[in-house]
UniProtKB/Swiss-Prot annotation:
Residue sites binding substrate per the record: 147, 239, 315
Gene: Arsi
SUPFAM superfamilies, alphabetized: Alkaline phosphatase-like
UniProt subcellular location: Secreted; Endoplasmic reticulum
Organism, as annotated: Rattus norvegicus
Organism lineage string: Eukaryota, Metazoa, Chordata, Craniata, Vertebrata
InterPro entries per record: Alkaline_phosphatase_core_sf (IPR017850), ARSB (IPR047115), Sulfatase_CS (IPR024607), Sulfatase_N (IPR000917)
Protein name per its UniProtKB record: Arylsulfatase I
Bias-annotated ranges (Acidic residues): 525-537
Cleaved signal peptide residues: 1-23
Enzyme active site: 93 (nucleophile), 149
Amino acid sequence: MHALSGFSLVSLLSLGYLSWDWAKPGLVADGPAEAEDQPSAAPPQPPHIIFILTDDQGYHDVGYHGSDIETPTLDRLAAEGVKLENYYIQPICTPSRSQLLTGRYQIHTGLQHSIIRPRQPNCLPLDQVTLPQKLQEAGYSTHMVGKWHLGFYRKECLPTRRGFDTFLGSLTGNVDYYTYDNCDGPGVCGFDLHEGESVAWGLSGQYSTMLYAQRASHILASHSPQKPLFLYVAFQAVHTPLQSPREYLYRYRTMGNVARRKYAAMVTCMDEAVRNITWALKRYGFYNNSVIIFSSDNGGQTFSGGSNWPLRGRKGTYWEGGVRGLGFVHSPLLKKKRRTSRALVHITDWYPTLVGLAGGTTSAADGLDGYDVWPAISEGRASPRTEILHNIDPLYNHARHGSLEGGFGIWNTAVQAAIRVGEWKLLTGDPGYGDWIPPQTLASFPGSWWNLERMASIRQAVWLFNISADPYEREDLADQRPDVVRTLLARLADYNRTAIPVRYPAANPRAHPDFNGGAWGPWASDEDEEEEDEEEEGRARSFPRGRRKKKCKICKLRSFFRKLNTRLMSHRI
């Protein structure tokens, strides 16, 4: 005890000498935070796949990008693996998750607009074969821990019906980290933590980052390394609300900005969670035949403590700060390690890449927009991807200065869209707030937040950048290169011809948690689904003679909420 004199428990935690995972009996056995690497041997096939997804982590919010936030585990794993420095995701939650699990752009799943909200009768289309389903076909055990956010209005939409053997996590977009409550408007609140298809009331009170890491470790402890495993860990961190255990806040006590301080503490806690999962992989015999993929889901929300510096924009925008992702691959199976890859990679690419690693196959009939990029990542070959459709959102067409004439008669530039072809990036419509927010503006709150470098022109609806030469999007070349603008507008039009209609239904009052025992969960039946389909068809064409819509109070409420969605909810993320 004398050796510890002058030190407090908090100071030990702040220095990283204690770990909440293996410090608790029965979760992970006592031992060092990093186990020794196991002797190399010819790995069996196929490999174990661990996909770790973080929520709202900014491009600048990792140590190896020069952040003031401590992420020693992520820094080490990235340094020993392959850093993906030309990696793209989507600007908000649902689209990134849908593209990860389907390998398809939003325009091919009907999820082009916004996110799936708790009261919407909507989910990842049931006709889509998901990544975990393909891995199950290849003989994998599949497990998910964390945030789903792909819809749940019917039981068929739940993770355990979409390819996962087990699930522990939340179904909605953001919950309290301790109580797991989530509100979708004033007075519309419910509990959202689920174990399989049941509400996990008994787990309330445990900080979600720790709970999810502990569950991941339990899965590894109870699973045989001889059977291939797919473990998808979708942390809630570091999405709002900004909540962190006190011991992590203490580490950043000198940060002047309260939001940044809480955010930094959450990132470091998440980093330690990744450390504990990695340690469990080594302890239970998975590591030598494993592939660990780390990815953010969208850009950081700068007004909630995140930073995307030196990139332009933030979460919810199509500037680089909204769509450039944090990503790396760590694996003993990599042929060329300890390097940075500039190969163009998009989140849709993980579907065919991981199916290929698993020994499965994909074909043109699958309609995938992703590519198998494993040779580019593992061996340093050229990426098969040369372009990315960031999105086309036909419902978001409010740019005042956009028009079909402004798009050379090829494209209505009022429509929000963004595309990358080779080194060129084109944006139309309203891409979102395009500020550059350097880290020094985060020193205090709220005054210095507004001391930003604002984008110079707002009276336009077309932007063109050479991303290879200008990754920070400072020099708009649209006026200088109308030939390139025409080419990319035509490419947008080509993509748009393959798009399916947007599915963004109005909120359904029956989804209220009060009708489901106080918890968010499935509420619709097959009859409800038929009625929804009937309403969708009715908006596109007149009903045939002799067929009449049901008259009901709920239908009138749906009409009201649909109008409300159009005016207000389309602007929220």
